From Swiss-Prot:
GO terms for biological process: RNA repair; tRNA 3'-terminal CCA addition. Monomer. Can also form homodimers and oligomers. Mg(2+) binds at D21, D23. Its cofactor is Mg(2+); Ni(2+). It comes from Variovorax paradoxus (strain S110). Keywords: ATP-binding, Hydrolase, Magnesium, Metal-binding, Multifunctional enzyme, Nickel, Nucleotide-binding, Nucleotidyltransferase, RNA repair, RNA-binding, Transferase, tRNA processing. It comes from the Bacteria. Comprises two domains: an N-terminal domain containing the nucleotidyltransferase activity and a C-terminal HD domain associated with both phosphodiesterase and phosphatase activities. This is Multifunctional CCA protein. ATP binds at G8, R11, R91, R149, R152. Residues 238-339 form the HD domain. InterPro entries: CCA_bact, HD/PDEase_dom, HD_domain, NT_sf, PolA_pol_head_dom, PolyA_RNA-bd, tRNA_CCA-adding_enzyme. The keyword Metal-binding applies.
Amino acid sequence: MKTYLVGGALRDRLLGRPVSDHDWLVVGATPEEMAARGYLPVGRDFPVFLHPQTREEYALARTERKSAPGYRGFTVHASPDVTLEQDLARRDLTVNAIALPAEFVGTDGRFEPDAGKLADPFHGRRDLEHKLLRHVTDAFREDPVRILRVARFAARFDDFSVAPETMALMREMVQAGEADALVPERVWQELSRGLMETRPSRMFEVLRACGALAVLLPEVDRLWGVPQPEAHHPEVDCGVHLMMVIDTSAKLQASLPVRFACLMHDLGKGTTEPGLLPRHIGHEKRSAELLHAVCDRWRVPVEIRELAEVVAREHGNIHRSGELAAAALVRLLERCDAFRKPARFADVLLACECDARGRLGFEDRPYPQRERLLAVLATAAGVPTEAVARAAQQSGAAGPQIGEAIHRARVEAVAALPG
């Protein structure tokens, strides 16, 4: 029985990045031996155990063979006769197929990877030095989720490139229809993780390069090559603009709902009639409609979907909010449900700021609309609605008339703001 540190911890340490989680591989052991040592079994599809003290995961060495379509269509063989190299061979990328014997890892989890101690049969360390994402073996093609994982790693390690042979293999998989077999839960899991990486645009660039974006998110894929007015968008291309917007959301450390809203906000520009280009009148409404199909397809959580819809529908009005009178400003707040959900409205404004700054030459410009609308909301929300409602009732108002009285009071308060 021999234990190794494997995967991301080694990769990140070799890159000089912080190491958080440790994944362990056990070669030459049975489930019974692990249980006898106090390890707790937790794996459903293959033998994985929790350490009795640290609660870190220890997996028995295994091989996998594709035996049926789908995410779970694998035959797993885990036994003491599976070697370290056989286990590493089933992994997706060479940079994730490196191992270090546990005796070189301190009790505090610290370790210094030394070339003489590393098990690196697929030259992952060399690929780290050359900044390459390369598949381990041709078995990569058996799991189409790996297309998404490669794209996600490209977003995390944004100075890495995908090895030409790996990109070619990914293209073959897409052309063979492998991307069509991806289950919604896994697609959303990888997309959401990719959006939260350092440079999310790299994920979509890789997916586009291999053809998977046209399969998974055709609404996004068709934005490339669609022009916008150069006066407002010096980058011109809608696809280029979208990538700048989601990278701005990462730069501003936005939450996942905000980043997804940024990804969805301009979908309608891909359906503008060619004769109307480069203008995109009404694209906000079309964007809000198109994102429903995306969210249904990949089972996007409701709260993330709802924020994206508000941003898609209202971002143009928010950009132009400096031109709006008090009544129009209050109606904008009402449409955004800002009085009931002020925190979500702040997220809406952050997504709009990412949109405004995700343009060539506008990256560092201020976005005064955000602070102004927050001030407008604070003023309108400060209206004593219960007192206004009582006064309206005493004057004989009922039902919708009470709501109209509250609306008028908010408009009056906003109209009194300076500037």
